[in-house]
Amino acid sequence: MKQYLELLNRVLTEGVRKEDRTGTGTISVFGHQMRFNLEEGFPLLTTKKLHLKSIIYELLWFLNGDTNVKYLQDHGVRIWNEWADADGSLGHIYGYQWRSWPDYKGGSIDQITEAVETIKHNPDSRRIIVSAWNVADLDNMNLPPCHAFFQFYVANGRLSLQLYQRSADIFLGVPFNIASYALLLQMMAQATGLKAGDFVHTLGDAHIYSNHLEQVKLQLTREPRALPRMEINPDVKSIFDFKFEDFNLTGYDPHPHIKGEVAV
């Protein structure tokens, strides 16, 4: 995944110093894009080991429309604990917006179901978009969405996905986001009878936190290895029927994990 290392290097060489909400401080650039062809392999970072279990369970949690950390904690995933209320609630974050976007009539819109149906029945549509950035609901979210919205594109029997991420923690968050949306693309492709095409990752404020600089420099000394493959249970036909056991990663040979503290 040289695209990712090129992003790290760009921010180190061109980035400007900025203060941030957490008080940690960052260096950042504005506007960057990476493209991953899923036919070439599953884009799971190899220059440090990632916790795939957390990525899969978080995505299933989003797709279930859940916004309480209990489901994640029950499966040993703690990545959302810092933002949860005492009862485990995170407010109207991703899963709520994806599956239950409030409409003006007092009902709700299931954006994922609508995306699936549009891909199947109107694949040339330029409106196959799922948004988590609900301006009217931001105050009801414990953490406003960093990966704000994504769009599907169908051509030549291939389904592609482009994500716009307004705020991108490059060292900790972005590797998770790449893998999560690449996996979502594979799942949606299977659920709609298409091949998985390109995942296009567009970043707004792409930043490295000041307490991750040494880790980033270490990572840049490592040579990327061959990408793994993600095998998905072919019997699953609905985007909502996937379980953790339906995913099998093969050929993953990463460099050792590099620890970094989360800026809350």
Curated annotation (Swiss-Prot):
User: At which positions is dUMP bound?
Assistant: R21, R126, R127, R166, S167, A168, D169, N177, H207, I208, Y209
Question: Which residues make up the binding site for (6R)-5,10-methylene-5,6,7,8-tetrahydrofolate?
Answer: H51, D169, A263
- Give UniProt keywords alphabetically: Cytoplasm, Methyltransferase, Nucleotide biosynthesis, Transferase
Q: In which pathway does it act?
A: Pyrimidine metabolism; dTTP biosynthesis
**What's in the GO CC field?**
cytosol
Q: What does this protein do?
A: Catalyzes the reductive methylation of 2'-deoxyuridine-5'-monophosphate (dUMP) to 2'-deoxythymidine-5'-monophosphate (dTMP) while utilizing 5,10-methylenetetrahydrofolate (mTHF) as the methyl donor and reductant in the reaction, yielding dihydrofolate (DHF) as a by-product. This enzymatic reaction provides an intracellular de novo source of dTMP, an essential precursor for DNA biosynthesis.
Residues at the active site:
C146
* Biological process terms in GO annotation: dTMP biosynthetic process; dTTP biosynthetic process; methylation
Q: Give any Pfam family that matches.
A: Thymidylat_synt
Q: Name one GO molecular function term.
A: thymidylate synthase activity
InterPro entries annotated for this entry? Thymidate_synth/dCMP_Mease (IPR045097), Thymidate_synth/dCMP_Mease_dom (IPR023451), Thymidate_synth/dCMP_Mease_sf (IPR036926), Thymidylate_synthase (IPR000398), Thymidylate_synthase_AS (IPR020940)
Family from the record: Belongs to the thymidylate synthase family. Bacterial-type ThyA subfamily.
Protein's name according to its UniProt entry: Thymidylate synthase
What catalytic reaction does the record list? dUMP + (6R)-5,10-methylene-5,6,7,8-tetrahydrofolate = 7,8-dihydrofolate + dTMP
Organism lineage reads as:
Bacteria, Pseudomonadati, Bacteroidota, Bacteroidia, Bacteroidales
- State the CDD domains in the record: TS_Pyrimidine_HMase
This protein's superkingdom? Bacteria
Subunit text: Homodimer.
Protein's cellular compartments: Cytoplasm
Which E.C. number(s) belong to this protein?
2.1.1.45
